[in-house]
Amino acid sequence: MKISFMTKEEFLTSLSEYPYKKLFVKSLEEAAYCKTEFFSEGMFGILKIPDKRNLQGKFLIAAYYVKKGEIIFLDEDKVIHPVLEKRKELKDIEEGQELGILLAVLNGLIEDEVPYLQKIEEKITELEDILIVQPPRDFPEVLTRFRRAMTRLHGFYVQLLDVIEEIQGNLGERLSE
């Protein structure tokens, strides 16, 4: 089985046959949320991920295209590559396990979030301690920015879990065929 990384341009100019190639690229360019699309020969999906270095800024975009014997990641923002690097055992999986590999990568994205969320929890505790003593004058603005950042993260986690559930459901259907 082949796992590869491409840029959007490399994917578009690839000589290989990829059903729904143009729809995939259009979905990537207009990414509004995390989603996955299934078709008879495979599936593709888009991940719109909040940038933890700047939660108020632009989203990071990654995508995957899966067909029998092949997974292609479009990952110019370098979101998927580190997850796959940590899971080197996934590179030796046989053909027919494409969706299992994809699920492992998506679950890896969630696992990598746990330490980050623990740091946020610590910051919240620090803020609570400060607020008990003396609330700062700009507290409403700070709270609003923080709430917006948490809303972005929450939206991503909900969408990612929806994508994972959809893939698991589709995997179950394919196994029962």
Descriptions of predicted regions:
Residues R137-E177:
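Membrane-associated alpha-helical segments
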Residues D75, I93-Q97, Y116-K119, F156:
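A generic short alpha-helical patch detector that favors 3-5-residue windows
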Residues I93-L109, E113, L175-E177:
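Long, non-coiled-coil amphipathic alpha-helical linker/lever segments
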Residues G108, D112, Q134, N170:
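Residue-level signal for short amphipathic helical patches enriched in basic/charged
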Residues M1-I93, K123, Q159-L175:
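Helix-boundary and N-terminal cytosolic regulatory elements
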